[in-house]
Amino acid sequence: MIRKSLLFLLLGLTLTAGLDQAVKYWVMQNMPLGTEIPLIPFLSLYHVRNSGIAFSFFSSFSHWGIIAITIIVIIFLLWLWKNTEDNKFLMRFGLVLIIGGAIGNLIDRIRFHHVTDYILFYIDDIFYFAIFNLADSFITLGVIVILIEELRTWMKAKRDSNHTSSH
């Protein structure tokens, strides 16, 4: 019988990577490269290709170098997930978001030699944030969830330590 935690991992990875790929497919099929679709005053869909990693970092690395780095990171994160206690739900949830996002972008790199990005935040002609995709959002959200969980754990340990030392 498959453990609940493994089922959670597989379902989470399938949902995150699958949703990312579905949106990218829609963008590639319906928006020519360089096309912008304004959604609301500060948010547009804008179809671009990114040969680097986050915010075009490592764009000078070879295609296979970026794929190798991504696979190594995914393996390490899976190891972390496996070695995280079952009761640390937020930690595991954050790891699933990060791994799923990494897999979504890895699929693009293997298939197309680039990642499709399409989310653009901006303020008129004053400020433009880096264009990114849903996989990047999952990765960022996963990091935030893990940081919140770690902060929560640290604060609880500090409270418990203060409580026991005052007696």
From Swiss-Prot:
The Gene Ontology CC terms held by the record are: plasma membrane
Tell me a GO biological process for this protein.
proteolysis
The pathway where this protein functions is: Protein modification; lipoprotein biosynthesis (signal peptide cleavage)
EC annotation from Swiss-Prot or TrEMBL: 3.4.23.36
> Would I find Cell membrane among this entry's keywords?
yes
Membrane topology classification: Multi-pass membrane protein
Localization terms from the record: Cell inner membrane
- What's the superkingdom here? Bacteria
Broadest EC class? hydrolase
Q: Which reaction does it catalyse?
A: Release of signal peptides from bacterial membrane prolipoproteins. Hydrolyzes -Xaa-Yaa-Zaa-|-(S,diacylglyceryl)Cys-, in which Xaa is hydrophobic (preferably Leu), and Yaa (Ala or Ser) and Zaa (Gly or Ala) have small, neutral side chains
For this protein, the parts annotated as crossing the membrane are 7-27, 61-81, 87-107, 126-146
Q: Which residues form a coiled coil?
A: none
Keywords (alphabetical) are:
Aspartyl protease, Cell inner membrane, Cell membrane, Hydrolase, Membrane, Protease, Transmembrane, Transmembrane helix
Location of the active site: 117, 136
| Molecular function in Gene Ontology | aspartic-type endopeptidase activity
Q: Where does this chain mainly localize?
A: membrane
- The reply on keyword Transmembrane helix is yes
Task: Extract the InterPro entries matched here.
Answer: Peptidase_A8
The record's function comment reads:
This protein specifically catalyzes the removal of signal peptides from prolipoproteins.
UniProt lists the family membership as follows: Belongs to the peptidase A8 family.
Q: What PANTHER family does the annotation carry? A: LIPOPROTEIN SIGNAL PEPTIDASE
Q: What is this protein called?
A: Lipoprotein signal peptidase
Q: Which gene encodes it?
A: lspA
